[in-house]
A protein has these predicted regions:
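Acidic, His/Gly-enriched loop-helix segments that form or flank divalent-metal centers
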Residues: 1-102, 106-111, 122-125
């Protein structure tokens, strides 16, 4: 938030416009190799298994990290980022736990880029 407040008015408007544009894409449901995936930025705040994804607000997908000890879906895999896996016991590698896949390997903080293939579950690192 501090960085946002340091922007000039035009830059702040640009950020707000960008957020408005991506708000329609706060989550993505994908089917690959007969498996269903839900892709979100961070997690699903106030998760309710009876609630449809489009009933959540954009902020619900970007503000609260996923709890990998929790199984969000039994018939879908939740793929998340936002929190580097080094903070989740992943040693900078992709973490798979309870039908969740955490893919943020800390590339933005000097770690490596983790790539997860939805089709076959393989991992690659750059």
């Amino acid at each position: 938030m501090e960085e946002f407040l340091q922007l000039d008015d035009e830059e702040r408007e640009d950020v707000i416009e960008y957020i408005d544009e991506i708000s329609e894409e706060a989550f993505l449901e994908v089917m690959m190799a007969r498996k269903k995936f839900v892709l979100v930025h961070a997690g699903i705040r106030n998760f309710d298994p009876k609630k449809e994804l489009d009933e959540y607000d954009t902020e619900d997908f970007i503000t609260e990290p996923a709890d990998l000890d929790k199984t969000y879906y039994k018939n879908r895999t939740l793929v998340v980022g936002h929190v580097p896996t080094t903070e989740l016991g992943g040693e900078g590698k992709i973490v798979k736990k309870n039908n969740n896949v955490a893919i943020d390997c800390g590339c933005g903080k000097g770690g490596q880029l983790g790539i997860y293939c939805l089709g076959n579950g393989s991992e690659m690192y750059v």
